[in-house]
Amino acid sequence: YGKAFQMSREIIQIIKGLETSDGAGVKLRRIIGGPDLNMLDPFLLFDEFGSDDPNDYIGGFPPHPHRGFETITYMLNGKFKHKDSAGNEGYLTDGSVQWMTAGKGVIHSEMPEQTDGLSRGFQLWLNLPKNLKMIDPSYNDIPAESIPQIQIPGGLIKVICGEINGIKGPGRAHTGVFYYDISLSPKNNIEIPVDDNWNSFIYVYNG
């Protein structure tokens, strides 16, 4: 890699996130976009939602507007249906991703297609560059089987967006971004190349 990848980066902040709710009462943990970390450009928001109590998610996210950024929803467990004002619709299931570019504006909903069981996943908001904020809205539904997996010593990398070890993920961001789901067994480690000019964060959701 270039010089930008030849030094270790220091962790400058550790936060626990804010337990809150959004939509029609969906319980979640807000990591970015809360009082501890308002934003980390280009990351505007990062939420984890997860519960096996349907009362925590059954209300879903009724129609609401987005504009000027991208939303990436990564579903670990469960099933959601998304639908928008242009007539587009699709489903999020175990391990799948929905990549929505809101651009000049869209109204959409994300509603659970289950009445019991575990519903767990993440939503990330990415800011669009100023010159792209008024582009037409678009969607990319990415099934779990389209996300490459890389076996590493003591672990696994799912490449949602970006490139690592020559493997590219299916996500296509208008802003440069890497998005990996990494599993490591105890006492193992991994080095991830990140340009020195980029902001980055790690979220530990198990372990």
Where are these regions (language model features)?
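Conserved metal-binding segment of the jelly-roll/cupin
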Residues: 92-107
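Glycine- and acidic-residue-biased ligand/ion/polar-headgroup-sensing regions
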Residues: 67-87, 94-97, 192-207
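Short, solvent-exposed loop/turn segments at the edges of secondary structure
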Residues: 40, 67-69, 101-103, 119-121
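A short glycine-rich, His/Asp/Glu-containing loop-to-beta-strand
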Residues: 22-76, 147-191
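Long amphipathic alpha-helical segments that form oligomerization/scaffold cores
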Residues: 128-155
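Ligand-binding loop in jelly-roll beta-barrel domains
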Residues: 103-132
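Short, Lys/Arg-enriched N-terminal segments with co-localized hydrophobic residues
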Residues: 1-6
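Short, structured patches in soluble enzyme cores that scaffold and shape functional sites
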Residues: 123-130, 159-163, 183-186, 205-206
